[in-house]
């Protein structure tokens, strides 16, 4: 509990990552989804739709590739974005978007693009770097870790509960944040999303 109150990140093995902060975000002390757990994706295309059942790892990797195609995101910025992608997806595995219709999440919610993975080998490397690290709210819930593109060269609002992809890239590039964890604290600490 002390770790969570001080905003420390831990791996699934309990190892500390990052440093203490005054913020109250995010920590993993629960069973995390297995790479082979299933994501039921409502895939909209050409006016039609179908439900695809995908492995969790394959899904989040394809979303990372689809959300951030530029190499400027490689490294710490993409790692922060990957943490948001994983937490957001996990939230909808626990609270499906439409369980009655048989799906957890939709292509209108996340940019699922498996064909883009091969464009940049850093997509896989950056996801593997945060493979066993997760976020929880201050109260231990898996929260809806919202994220959007945001504007170039702007960090956006801190404690908003919504990570800006371009904001992460900007803060890392100018040295405002040195690690993905600092980006995550910037957006999620003491926000409505992470306090619940």
Model-predicted regions and their roles:
Residues 1-196:
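Conserved, single-site charged/polar hotspot
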């Amino acid at each position: 509990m002390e770790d969570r109150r001080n905003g420390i990140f831990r791996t699934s093995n309990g190892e500390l990552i990052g440093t203490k902060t005054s913020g109250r975000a995010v920590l993993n002390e629960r069973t995390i989804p297995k790479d082979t757990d299933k994501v039921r994706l409502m895939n909209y295309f050409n006016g039609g739709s179908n439900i695809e059942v995908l492995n969790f790892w394959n899904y989040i990797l394809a979303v990372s590739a689809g959300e951030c195609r530029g190499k400027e995101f490689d490294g710490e910025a993409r790692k922060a974005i990957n943490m948001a992608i994983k937490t957001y997806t996990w939230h909808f595995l626990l609270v499906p978007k439409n369980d009655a219709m048989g799906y957890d999440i939709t292509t209108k919610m996340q940019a699922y693009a498996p064909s883009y993975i091969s464009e940049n080998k850093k997509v896989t490397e950056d996801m593997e770097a945060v493979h066993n690290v997760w976020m929880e709210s201050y109260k231990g819930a898996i929260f809806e870790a919202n994220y959007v593109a945001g504007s170039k060269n702007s960090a956006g609002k801190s404690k908003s509960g919504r990570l800006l992809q371009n904001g992460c890239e900007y803060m890392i590039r100018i040295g405002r944040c040195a690690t993905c964890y600092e980006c995550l604290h910037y957006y999620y600490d003491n926000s409505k999303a992470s306090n619940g």
